[in-house]
Swiss-Prot record:
GO biological process: 'de novo' CTP biosynthetic process; UDP biosynthetic process
Group of enzyme by EC: transferase
Name of the gene this protein is made from: pyrH
Protein name per UniProt: Uridylate kinase
Activity regulation comment: Inhibited by UTP.
InterPro entries: AceGlu_kinase-like_sf (IPR036393), Asp/Glu/Uridylate_kinase (IPR001048), Uridylate_kinase (IPR011817), Uridylate_kinase_bac (IPR015963)
Annotated source species: Hydrogenovibrio crunogenus (strain DSM 25203 / XCL-2) (Thiomicrospira crunogena)
Subunit structure: Homohexamer.
Transmembrane segments: none
Pfam families, per database record: AA_kinase (PF00696)
Physiological role: Catalyzes the reversible phosphorylation of UMP to UDP.
Keyword set, alphabetical order: ATP-binding, Cytoplasm, Kinase, Nucleotide-binding, Pyrimidine biosynthesis, Transferase
EC number(s) on file: 2.7.4.22
Amino acid sequence: MSLKYARVLLKFSGEALMGQGQFGLDSNTLRQVVLEVKALRDLGVEVGLVVGGGNIFRGAQIEGAGIQRTTGDHMGMMATVINALALRDVIEDMGMSSVVYSAMAIEGVSHGFNANHVKKGMAEGQVAIFAAGTGSPFFTTDTAAALRGIEIDADIVLKATKVDGIYTADPAKDSSAQRLAELTYDDVIQKNLQVMDMTAFVLCRDHKMPIRVFDMFKKDAVIRIVKGEDEGTLVH
């Protein structure tokens, strides 16, 4: 089977793992996400994951409490580690091999990030999960996804969202909104489209890393993407 993308970096939010809940992890949603990963692995696609931590902690929760921004960001990074560990175990429960690489040193819990080591493991079939963002405050997990995607020589960054691409307007508010099949990086920046943060977009643009925005819960969407079919919105 011919695949357009052999190595992908999949980014999704921590909130996506809550299911219908308001906090934490939903077991059915976790397994649903990992089934998409398994579908990719069954095709032979090498997979790296970046997950947010908003289902466990968000900085806005502590604004005004006297906690510094840098401390809040570090707390958010730790939340992504919790999600990464959960994903690793579910991935392995489904018969795959997986390793958590954290940008923050957590001895006995995760591995430190080394691009060459990661790429070797992925080539051998391991699903690489990148936790703790970039390891530095003031950077989002979107930026971490862009950075890790570039570092591991991914063919594309797949940005999973609640909608099936980028639209001309908010489809939840405007019934005439149309999905845009393709955009350039500069289109997104000039129009200030709020799907991925600008730092991440500029990083991808400067390193010619394509981004595909898609609905992570649309059945087989990620499979269609790696086969080169029209799905979501391509930014390149």
